[in-house]
Regions:
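N-terminal, Lys/Arg- and Ser/Thr-rich interaction peptides
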Residues: 1-38
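Interfaces that engage single-stranded nucleic acids at replication/repair/recombination sites
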Residues: 1-6, 139-171
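Intrinsically disordered, low-complexity regions
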Residues: 6-15, 23, 45, 136, ...
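Positively charged, aromatic-enriched nucleic acid-contacting surfaces
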Residues: 29, 36-145
Length: 171
């Protein structure tokens, strides 16, 4: 069964397409993977459900060991005045940098990673997670799609990052 063939994909289909402007390649495990800007995911959730705290929210807890911090995230969203959710989704991050100093951003990094994984279960950036960003033709299609109407197949209004950078540089 493909997306769009049943009403069960109503969130997935709105959130599956990724604007390439919010991605970047990074090397890992001997190949190049695609990473997604986490704030673009927050923007997408806001476009889908409304402001954080009102239309969607997350709850997180941390567990610390001598070397690591574990973040557990529960994601919730409102649909027709009913809250839905799932989780916890977990992630772990080292508390110390390679030079031995404390990484004071470790909890934030673990939370961000858990949110990204959790958002993927709703369908956010599904094209990246399904490996479609390994295909240059697909990326070109997404660039065209997002440059044409700003929101691809979705009802989510995506802000053009190039325009944001230009506006910021003009100030």
């Amino acid at each position: 069964m493909r997306t769009g063939e049943t009403k069960n994909y109503y969130i997935w289909d709105k959130a599956k397409a990724t604007d390439p402007a919010w991605t970047k390649p990074f090397p890992k495990f001997g190949k190049t993977l695609t990473t997604i800007d986490p704030m673009s995911q927050v923007m997408c959730m806001t476009g889908l459900f409304g402001p954080v705290g009102k239309g969607w929210r997350f709850k997180n807890t941390y567990t610390y060991t001598d070397q690591n911090v574990f973040a557990e995230v529960i994601i919730q969203w409102k649909d027709n005045d009913t809250w839905y959710g799932y989780g916890p989704i977990s992630s772990v991050c080292a508390l110390y940098k390679k030079n031995g100093s404390l990484d004071d951003e470790a909890p934030k990094k673990a939370t961000t990673d858990a949110l990204t994984k959790g958002f993927s279960y709703l369908g956010l950036n599904a094209d990246v997670f399904l490996g479609m960003f390994d295909n240059n033709k697909y990326i070109s299609e997404m660039k065209t799609k997002f440059s044409t109407n700003g929101s691809a197949e979705s009802n989510v209004k995506i802000i053009d990052p190039a325009k944001l950078r230009k506006d910021k540089d003009d100030k």
